Curated annotation (Swiss-Prot):
The keyword Transport is annotated on this UniProt entry: yes
Keyword flag Nucleotidyltransferase: no
NCBIfam families: NDH_I_L, PRK06590.1
Highest taxon listed in the record's lineage: Eukaryota
Recorded GO MF terms: NADH dehydrogenase (ubiquinone) activity; quinone binding
Family under the similarity heading: Belongs to the complex I subunit 5 family.
Role description: NDH shuttles electrons from NAD(P)H:plastoquinone, via FMN and iron-sulfur (Fe-S) centers, to quinones in the photosynthetic chain and possibly in a chloroplast respiratory chain. The immediate electron acceptor for the enzyme in this species is believed to be plastoquinone. Couples the redox reaction to proton translocation, and thus conserves the redox energy in a proton gradient.
Gene: ndhF
Name used for this protein in its record: NAD(P)H-quinone oxidoreductase subunit 5, chloroplastic
Sequence intervals crossing the membrane: 9-29, 40-60, 89-109, 125-145, 147-167, 185-205, 221-241, 258-278, 280-300, 327-347, 354-374, 396-416, 425-445, 547-567, 608-628, 723-743
Any single GO BP term: ATP synthesis coupled electron transport
Catalytic activity from the UniProt record: a plastoquinone + NADH + (n+1) H(+)(in) = a plastoquinol + NAD(+) + n H(+)(out); a plastoquinone + NADPH + (n+1) H(+)(in) = a plastoquinol + NADP(+) + n H(+)(out)
UniProt-listed Enzyme Commission number(s): 7.1.1.-
Record's subcellular location: Plastid, Chloroplast thylakoid membrane
Length: 746
């Protein structure tokens, strides 16, 4: 056992040979490296599998022995300061390692097919290997300095992966936005780390917690300064886990390849913030104000993420806002002191959301056969519909992931989300109302995504759109660059009826029609039966087996992973593996956690949350399920048009909700006008001051010296007699001035 732990330090470095060898190979032997590209995929999967098996073994040992292992090496810089680095293995480390490796392996298998057409295939796997190394290094770190080092590496890798198709301006802007937003959080984290070191004199977690708690209990430190340092530490997870108000980078991160979206939004980058708060919870828990701030930020993010997901048309952005909302639930649980519930939801959500993102990638892959390599079209749910018969396996996997996220039993997220909802009842009635209401919103927007994607008929082939016949369509090259291609003259490029009149999604049809104003301004999308294009020949198709296999494995995880945390302890049967793993665990809401849930209490608590979820599903079916005709997607606004004017206020409310959601709560616009524009103006003024004033003074002195020298040289004429004459003249002038001032005094 002890011998096994001694080799745990190697965990972060096992995936590292792949990016190193790829970099060296592409530099020195590019042709051979590219010809053996499938070998690099196999090697990446094999190395991650080793870590997964090792992490599973460590977890099994910890379930039975409940031990924590830490090994530290000391590097003495001088007599007063020494830097210690090492590894820290506890249940949280084991759980995160298993999560990172299992999802990472499945994403790598998926990416082998999904990215096979891309010229950046090897670059993609090099980034992925480095990303996995960074995350594994983060979760095994034994001190805050190591955490910060790997934290920055995770941010750098996410920058590279989000901007993978860097030739597309929108992707380049997205990765810059993610990078800059996370720099704000990272700066706060760095200040918090330095403040804690100034207070405690240690970076090591165990020493830090012990010293910190003693200082607080004995009132030997300024509580205000302590709270400030703790809050600065929390700013880092706010940005990394996309919590309000530093969440603005998350939807734009969808510009990267879909496997990256699955990895970032499931088990890696966004989970890093939750991991760090969980790791530092013994420090936060002694400061009640910080715990309340954590829970407050969490509940705001829960509601905001759900409302922003209501009207998204891009399937990946809808799932991104869903991730934001679910991360809010985890942060809420940590702020309430429910450590187990937060980590349980982290696990169940990771597998469910990875399934949904890989499913969306399969859908996008199938749509590209029709609309080309253009995210504006292949990810637009309004162009989808009726995919059930074309991609049946993807449909089943996506439906299971959707039901899980909605909290429908017995799927994974039901068990974890229900725990958080029940804990919120004990913590605050207001927080509980918001949390339960958001559970209904989650069910609504997730089934909205499902219905728009799979139900009805394929909307790409409907004909009721406006546009110019002489248009061009944009596709994405293998490097992600948008290329303009002229269409066949027999066809017209027609923009889709959209709720935002300034942005259009396009596809091919035979004719174009003008849309009346009353239809153009509709709140919800309505595609009416105008007939299909008789010249259409292409349909979506099911993805290859290497794409479907990871989805089916994640489907099994979604079905059964919730069993590890089922809180039933009756008649000698104990299914709660998670509580055994997290023993002793922090739980402020359940002091007596030996057997606080029985069958009756569980059914009573679960009935209400499941009822709310089914209500949200019903509303989604009412608005988006086509039931008047097989070719008619009925929405709420169609019903409003047949009712009297008393519905105008309700219609205005719906329009407000839509505009709020579609425009991202106007938060991006606020940041752009109040912060970005101000910073740009300041940068321009600073640039002007630097170029014109500072450089002007420096250059002016230089130019003046040059001209004085030239004049002096001209007057002197390079003759000694001239130099003596000038010298004596200057001395005479000096004496005259001195004599004048001397006699002035008398």
């Amino acid at each position: 056992m002890e011998h096994t732990y001694e080799y745990s330090w190697i965990i972060p470095f096992i995936p590292l040979p792949v990016p190193i060898l790829l970099g060296v190979g592409l530099l020195l032997f590019p042709t051979a490296t590219k010809n053996l590209r499938r070998m690099w995929t196999f090697l990446s999967i094999f190395l991650l599998s080793i870590i997964m098996i090792f992490s599973l073994y460590l977890s099994i040992q910890q379930i039975f022995l409940s031990c924590i292992h830490q090994n530290v090496w000391s590097w003495t810089i001088n007599n007063e300061f020494s830097f210690e680095f090492g590894y820290f293995i506890d249940p949280l480390t084991s759980i995160m390692s298993i999560l990172i490796t299992t999802v990472g392996i499945l994403v790598l298998i998926y990416s082998d097919n999904y990215m096979s057409h891309d010229q950046g295939y090897l670059r993609f796997f090099a980034y992925m290997g480095f990303f996995n190394t960074s995350m594994l290094g983060l979760v095994t770190s034994s001190n805050l300095i190591q955490v910060y080092f790997f934290w920055e590496l995770v941010g750098m890798c996410s920058y590279l992966l989000i901007g993978f198709w860097f030739t597309r301006p929108i992707a380049a802007n997205a990765c810059q936005k993610a990078f800059v937003t996370n720099r704000v959080g990272d700066f706060g984290l760095l200040l918090g780390i330095l403040g804690l070191y100034w207070i405690t004199g240690s970076f090591e977690f165990q020493d830090l917690f012990e010293i910190f708690n003693n200082l607080v209990l004995n009132n030997r430190v300024n509580l205000l300064f302590l709270t400030l340092c703790a809050f600065l530490l929390f700013v880092g997870p706010i940005a990394k886990s996309a919590q309000f108000p530093l969440h603005v980078w998350l939807p734009d991160a969808m510009e990267g390849p879909t496997p990256i979206s699955a990895l970032i939004h499931a088990a890696t980058m966004v989970a890093a913030g939750i991991f760090l708060v969980a790791r530092l919870l013994p420090l936060f828990i002694v400061i009640p104000s910080i715990m309340y701030i954590i829970s407050l930020i969490g509940i705001i993010t829960v509601l905001l993420g759900a409302t922003l997901a209501l009207a998204q048309k891009d399937i990946k952005r809808g799932l991104a806002y869903s991730t934001m909302s679910q991360l809010g639930y985890m942060m809420l649980a940590l702020g309430m002191g429910s450590y187990r519930s937060a980590l349980f939801h982290l696990i169940t959500h990771a597998y469910s959301k990875a399934l949904l993102f890989l499913g969306s990638g399969s859908i996008i892959h199938s749509m590209e056969a029709i609309v080309g390599y253009s995210p504006d079209k292949s990810q637009n749910m309004i162009l989808m519909g009726g995919l059930t018969k074309h991609v049946p396996i993807t449909k089943i996997a996506f439906l299971v992931g959707t039901l899980s996220l909605c909290g429908i039993p017995p799927l994974a997220c039901f068990w974890s989300k229900d725990e958080i909802l029940n804990d919120s009842l004990l913590f605050s009635p207001i927080f509980a109302i918001i949390a339960f209401s958001t559970a209904g919103l989650t069910a609504f927007y997730m089934f909205r995504i499902y219905l728009l994607t799979f139900e009805g008929h394929l909307n790409t082939y409907f004909i009721n759109y406006s546009g110019k016949k002489s248009s061009s369509v944009y596709s994405i090259s293998l490097w992600g660059k948008e290329e303009e291609k002229k269409l066949n003259r027999n066809f017209g490029l027609v923009p889709l009826l959209t709720m935002n009149n300034t942005k259009r999604a396009s596809f091919f049809c035979k004719k174009t029609y003008k849309i009346s104003n009353n239809v153009r301004n509709q709140t919800f999308i309505t595609v009416e039966n105008f007939g299909l294009n008789p010249r259409t020949f292409y349909y979506p198709h099911e993805s290859d087996n290497t794409i479907l296999f990871p989805m089916l494995v994640l489907l099994l995880f979604t079905l059964f992973i919730g069993a590890i945390g089922i809180p039933f302890t009756q008649e000698g049967l104990d299914f709660d593996i998670l509580s055994k793993l997290f023993t002793p665990s922090i739980n402020l809401l359940h002091k007596n956690s030996e057997s606080f849930v029985d069958w009756y209490e569980f059914l009573r608590n679960a009935t209400f949350s499941v009822s709310i979820a089914f209500f949200g599903i019903f509303i989604a079916y009412y608005l988006y399920k086509p039931f008047y005709s097989s070719l008619l997607n009925l929405t709420l606004l169609n019903s409003f048009q047949k009712l009297n004017s008393k519905r105008i206020r309700w219609e205005k409310l719906i329009n407000f909700v839509y505009n709020w959601s579609y425009n991202r709560g106007y938060i991006d616009a606020f940041f752009k006008t109040s912060l970005i524009e101000s910073i740009r103006r300041l940068a321009k003024q600073t640039n002007f001051f630097d170029k014109r004033i500072i450089d002007g003074i420096t250059n002016g002195v230089g130019i003046t010296s040059f001209f004085v020298g030239e004049v002096t040289k001209y007057i002197g004429g390079s003759r000694i007699s001239s130099y003596l004459f000038l010298y004596l003249s200057y001395v005479l002038i000096f004496l005259m001035i001195l004599f004048f001032f001397y006699f002035e005094k008398f």
